[in-house]
Amino acid sequence: MFTLIFLFLFLNIPLLVADFISPRCFWKMKQNEYRDRHHGTGCIFLILAIQQPVKKEYFSHILNIQTHTENHKYALALAFSIYEINRNPDLLPNMSLIFIFSADSCEWESELSLIRFGLQNSDNLPNYLCEELTKCILALTNMNWATTVTLHTILSNFLSDQLLHITYGTFHPALSDHEKFPYLHQMASDHTSLALALVSFIIHFGWNWVGLVISDSDQGIQFLSYLRREMEKYTLCFAFVNMIPLNINLYMSRAEVYYNQIMTSSTNVVIIYGDTDSTLAVSFRMWESLGIQRLWITTSQWDVSPSMKDFTFGNKYGTFAFEQHHSEISGFKHFVQTLNSVKCPDEYLVKLEWMHFNCEVSASKCKTLKNCSSNHSLKWLMVHTFDMAFIEESYYIYNAVYAFAHVLHQFTFQKFDNLPKDNGKEHNYSCKKLYSYLRKNHFINPVGDRVSMNQRDKLQEEYDIVYIWNFPQGLGLRVKIGMFSPYFPNGQQVHLSEDMLKWARGSTQVPTSMCSADCGPGSRKFRMDGMAACCFHCKPCPENEISNETNVDNCVQCPEDQYANTEQNHCIRKAVVFLSYEEPLGVALSLLSLCFSAFTTVVLGIFVKHHNTPIVKANNRTLTYLLLISLIFCFLCPLLFIGHPNSATCILQQLTFGVVFTVSLSTVLAKTITVVLAFKIIASQRMMKYFLISGAINYIIPICILIQVIVCAVWLRASPPSVDIDAHSEHGQIIIVCHKGSVNAFYCVLGYLAILAFGSFTLAFLSRNLPGAFNEAKSITFSMLVFCSVWVTFIPVYHSTKGKVMVAVEIFSTLASSAGMLGCIFVPKCYTILFRQDQNSLEMIRVKSSSNVHVS
């Protein structure tokens, strides 16, 4: 035991020491004088197991620890856990756990004097029991990893069989090496889910540009690798990564660089991760005091609650802390509220206020404190001084004490059951055996949480998200606003009560932290070489491409039947355009077609009615009727071009056009040949006369039609007309027209019609001066001249237009050429039949014939 005293003097570090001595020396000391100064980071506790009950008043002396708030929380957590265990009849029955520590400050000199006094004057201690069963030392510490390694190494050399070392601080990978530290156990988990929790939290607020400040240590580098891997999955970027060196001299030489990097960075969110007793803590406090306006994200071990004395610049954004989730410890607040000092009921309140307001405490007990008031309730202080809900380290202490109690329970009663009841000699066992039990131990703690002492069996951590609410300045409320659970689906792992957030001194607007402004709908991201994945420029989408989300890498091409709107964030279905009966142009052309066909029908009726008149007889009534009927169909052909095209109408358009016009032109050709033969034949040409009289000339018509039908058949065989959907010629429109199929075949049809028209024109032109009262040569000449002019003009105009205008040009050409033949050949005759009947007689025919002969 004197070796242990030497180690305490040498290390000058706080320990929580559990000494299983059943029973050893139990006594209670009175309070000593307070010393107004700051001390170490913890207190030394001796935890003993005795075979008698312990009253609750025993725990009141823990309130006399005059140290900073963090240690006070740990001491209260230790006292409460021991208090619960002692009240549990199923855990360590007939045994009680107690702790011994100095009534003065938690400094090693007073604790050492307590240990020395207890060991040297054990006979004078009350409740002394002489039977000593065995000993085992539990070292429960919260130090940085280097100090922990030093402590564990030294204690192991001196107390290898009596050391059971448990840490409740931050997990460090170096301490998880069981070969180097076989009897060291870490209560904290390795925080494998912390990186995912931070990334999910960042994504929840739409941030992608954050800064990171870590300690330049193995722990910091490991956390950086975890965090970088998670951030790369979701395209999040570091604005900067500051690795704060542990060496104070190296840090001081670069402190200004770290400060300028944070100040000049465009990010508003900075993550802090590292040891709280390192140079990183110095940096963080300095940045806070200088009023750097950033939103800080830390872990639970950082005490980021501002004190009421910190009336400096203040941070308008506040701080978030991630704490390991655990159920609420019921009864803890009531336990603390019912604890009072023996002599001075208000003394505990005064001490809490001293810790909160940084007041000066008088050297004597129960005196009025300078600049302080003791009239506040304990309940208020528990909320505003420090939250009495268990923090992460307090919860580790709670579970560590319970784990130790369970191990003692299992080992002790199993051992006693297996012992022979003989001479009652001392049965010694080492902490090595206890540790083998401890590593395998798992239990359900009183709040219902499953606790496993095996690191491999520990579940992924859930985290409570705490917001340090500092509005008004200095309030420093720790408010739980949500939690993170890795067991929920992606995107639903963070749950926040955002109505509890107050940004920028009361504002509800979430601060932004983006490397680049969002590329809104209608644009895409464009990165230059060397830019981070989160940094980009915005470029509008190309023509007929859209983006309906923010920050897309590539725009999406609209389908063939759709086009992009002016904002290029939505595809609009293109209007289907064709020459329809509903639009004015279609209505006009269809009416014009019907009117011409009706007029032609009237002309046909006139000729039929006056079929015995000389003017009708003189021009071959059969050919006249055939020509008028074909013209009726020529005028009706445009109706096939109007309306929604389909495969049938597309084929009928061209075939009907070609065949019907062939009938018309071949009839005109036959009439022209008839005129020529009638006036050019001489008496010796009996064969020609027979040919004219017999009507053999009429066979020209079917022969011409047959040739055109053969051309059309070849056309249909090679490449028939079909529906053509043109989605590119006009913006926002799908033009549906009939494609000609084989263009060569189409021009062959037109060419054949041109040959017939040109032949008729030539013969009629040569016969224009032949005698005869009703010579049609001149009429046919003019009609063919109109026909040829129309279709010669049609070709260039047809190729220069598209869509329904092109269809309208073809319809107009059909109507114009047909109207030319109707007007030039039949309108003058109708005028004569209806209005100049005096000229439609045999006498007038003889007069005209004789005059024509005389002139000739």
Curated annotation (Swiss-Prot):
This protein's record includes keyword Signal: yes
Signal peptide span: 1-18
Pfam families: 7tm_3, ANF_receptor, NCD3G
Tissue: Expressed in the vomeronasal organ.
Biological process, per Gene Ontology: positive regulation of female receptivity; response to pheromone
Entry similarity comment: Belongs to the G-protein coupled receptor 3 family.
Gene disruption: observed consequences: No response of neurons in the vomeronasal organ or accessory olfactory bulb to Esp1 and no enhancement of lordosis following exposure to Esp1.
Cytoplasmic compartment spans: 608-622, 680-690, 767-778, 828-856
Protein purpose: Receptor for the Esp1 pheromone. Mediates the response to Esp1 which enhances female sexual receptive behavior (lordosis) upon male mounting, resulting in successful copulation.
MF terms in GO: pheromone receptor activity
TM ranges: 587-607, 623-643, 659-679, 691-711, 746-766, 779-799, 807-827
Native species: Mus musculus (Mouse)
Glycan attachment sites: 94
Subcellular location: Cell membrane
Keywords recorded for this protein, A-Z: Cell membrane, G-protein coupled receptor, Glycoprotein, Membrane, Pheromone response, Receptor, Signal, Transducer, Transmembrane, Transmembrane helix
Regions of this protein lying in the Extracellular compartment: 19-586, 644-658, 712-745, 800-806
Protein name listed in UniProt: Vomeronasal type-2 receptor 116
The encoding gene: Vmn2r116
InterPro entries: ANF_lig-bd_rcpt, GPCR_3, GPCR_3_9-Cys_dom, GPCR_3_9-Cys_sf, GPCR_3_C, GPCR_3_Ca_sens_rcpt-rel, GPCR_3_CS, GPCR_3_vmron_rcpt_2
Chief location of this protein within or outside the cell: membrane
GO cellular component, one term: plasma membrane
